[in-house]
């Protein structure tokens, strides 16, 4: 990242002050997945190029979020976030605030507001939209991390990788500012995972494309431009 100063300046603007990401060191070769499953899932051949990130046994959404947050604070010397939000659908604790663990590991003041958001991979984007639309005093630290378990021989096993990202939103020499946005909600189920289950259930990809991206997403883009 190439952030500017974290404090207000003459041309200070509210927006993204810095972004960082953290990926596990391990990589899974997609060709290795195909070699194991091509007898039953030959359609994976089209996805069997390259590799994806894979968390090790001692890594989870919290540890990856800590690393992403640590890199972000190093990029913004003197920045002390007043809030820390962790978005993930794979939080290691169901009844313990995961964001508080991250905040403690990052050395944030004990008065910082911490919260977990979950139930959808879109939760991180929703939190970012809220932070940009509703400026709050000080700097907001937004973290997102995932360590999803894909069903064997599924397209997700090829596509979904593990990792974390961190964003600082506040007033300063912003890398990017919020110009315009719109939202549209719909109970469109492209995939879902029931409570107590490890794997997602996904719908047919052409239906997701035609009924989801080409209808819902395009309508949202048009509404924003209007």
Predicted regions and their residues:
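Condensing-enzyme catalytic core mediating Claisen C-C bond formation in acyl metabolism
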Residues: 1-59, 154-222
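Phosphate/pyrophosphate-binding loops at sites that engage ATP/ADP/AMP, CoA/4′-phosphopantetheine
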Residues: 68-82, 220-226
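Short, surface-exposed alpha-helical segments at coil->helix boundaries
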Residues: 62-66, 96-100, 214
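Structural motif
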Residues: 85, 141-143, 167-169
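Generic secondary-structure signature for well-ordered alpha-helical cores
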Residues: 21, 74, 107-108, 133-136, ...
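Short glycine-rich or small-residue beta-strand-to-loop segments that form or flank ligand, phosphate
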Residues: 82-90
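Conserved catalytic cysteine-centered active-site region
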Residues: 43-46, 52-59, 89-139, 145, ...
């Amino acid at each position: 990242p190439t952030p500017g100063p974290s404090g207000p300046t003459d041309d200070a603007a509210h927006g993204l002050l810095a972004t960082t990401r953290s990926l596990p060191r391990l990589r899974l070769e997609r060709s290795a997945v195909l070699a194991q499953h091509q007898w039953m899932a030959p359609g994976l051949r089209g996805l069997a190029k390259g590799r994806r990130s894979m968390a090790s046994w001692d890594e989870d959404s919290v540890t990856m979020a800590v690393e992403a947050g640590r890199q972000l604070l190093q990029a913004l010397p003197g920045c002390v976030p007043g809030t820390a939000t962790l978005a993930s659908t794979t939080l290691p604790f169901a009844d313990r605030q995961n964001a508080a663990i991250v905040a403690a590991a990052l050395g944030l003041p004990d008065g910082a507001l911490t919260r977990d958001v979950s139930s959808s991979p879109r939760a991180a984007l929703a939190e970012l939209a809220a932070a940009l639309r509703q400026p709050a005093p000080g700097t907001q630290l937004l973290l997102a991390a995932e360590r999803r378990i894909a069903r064997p021989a599924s397209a997700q096993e090829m596509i979904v990788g593990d990792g974390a990202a961190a964003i600082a939103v506040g007033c300063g020499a912003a890398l990017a500012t919020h110009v315009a946005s719109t939202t549209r909600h719909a109970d469109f189920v492209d995939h879902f995972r029931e409570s107590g289950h490890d794997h997602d259930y996904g719908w047919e990809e052409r239906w997701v494309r035609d009924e989801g991206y080409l209808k819902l997403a395009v309508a949202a883009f048009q509404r924003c431009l209007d």
